[in-house]
């Protein structure tokens, strides 16, 4: 579908230390990603087979490397990390609807996975939950579709992924609209199921459920 292909880029963040995840990530991505899109991995020095790879080198912060990747993306970005192993099918028709709704409702970021700790504001005639300007995790690395210009605005070059969620959220909270609480126009699809398995936690610690997921998907241990 040319509509989605021209508007959406997949951006995957990684680093050399996470190379043991790449084969499993690729296996799951190729199995479950049903869209014809440009798929970019931003790493450090090592290419990821099967993906367009941008390698700024070592010595740069995660945020600086991601911003270089974002420069190469289209207007809308499906932004994930390499420890998110897809676990269910992602279809083109769904993303077409998401992009159409993002444009119709002037959405800056649409989170399309379940999440905890967020609070919401109401908005008439919009099918999604609007995350309050003062919510925890108004910035989240849960799978989301980002407007490119907004992602460039809120992702600072010195951030790590955890800084992006925590410090980035704090910046938006401090600068939010105290009355309407809707300045940032960040939303979540409240009906979206979880379609991925988070393989590791901070510190490269395997997440609970890894053994079961590995067996189900016939993956390799790492």
Can you describe what each PLM-predicted range is?
Residues 23-27, 63-67, 91-99, 163-169:
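Well-ordered, non-membrane alpha-helical segments in soluble/globular domains
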Residues 122-136:
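Short, flexible, basic/aromatic active-site loop/helix in glycosyltransferases
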Residues 1-76:
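N-terminal anchoring/stem segment of glycosyltransferases
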Residues 75-87:
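Short beta-strand-to-loop acidic/aromatic patch adjacent to the donor-nucleotide binding site
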Residues 138-212:
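Catalytic core and acceptor-binding pocket of nucleotide-sugar-dependent glycosyltransferases
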Residues 88-118:
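Conserved donor-nucleotide/metal-binding helix-loop-beta segment in metal-dependent transferases, i.e.
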């Amino acid at each position: 579908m040319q509509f989605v292909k021209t508007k959406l880029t997949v951006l995957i963040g990684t680093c050399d230390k996470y190379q043991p995840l790449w084969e499993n990530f690729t296996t799951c991505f190729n199995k479950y990603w049903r869209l014809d899109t440009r798929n970019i991995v931003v790493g450090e020095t090592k290419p990821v087979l099967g993906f367009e790879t941008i390698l700024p080198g070592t010595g740069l912060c995660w945020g600086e490397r991601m911003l270089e990747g974002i420069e190469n993306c289209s207007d809308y970005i499906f932004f994930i990390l390499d420890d998110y192993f897809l676990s269910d099918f992602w279809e083109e028709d769904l993303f077409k609807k998401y992009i159409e709704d993002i444009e119709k409702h002037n959405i800056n970021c649409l989170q399309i996975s379940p999440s905890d700790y967020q609070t919401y504001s109401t908005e008439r005639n919009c099918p999604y939950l609007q995350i309050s300007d003062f919510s925890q995790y108004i910035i989240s690395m849960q799978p989301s579709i980002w407007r490119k210009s907004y992602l460039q605005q809120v992702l600072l070059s010195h951030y790590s992924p955890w800084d992006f969620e925590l410090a980035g959220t704090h910046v938006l909270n401090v600068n939010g609209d105290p009355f309407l609480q809707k300045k940032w126009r960040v939303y979540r699809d409240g009906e979206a199921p979880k379609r991925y398995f988070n393989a590791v936690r901070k510190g490269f610690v395997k997440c609970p459920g890894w053994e079961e997921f590995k067996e189900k998907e016939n993956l390799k241990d790492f």
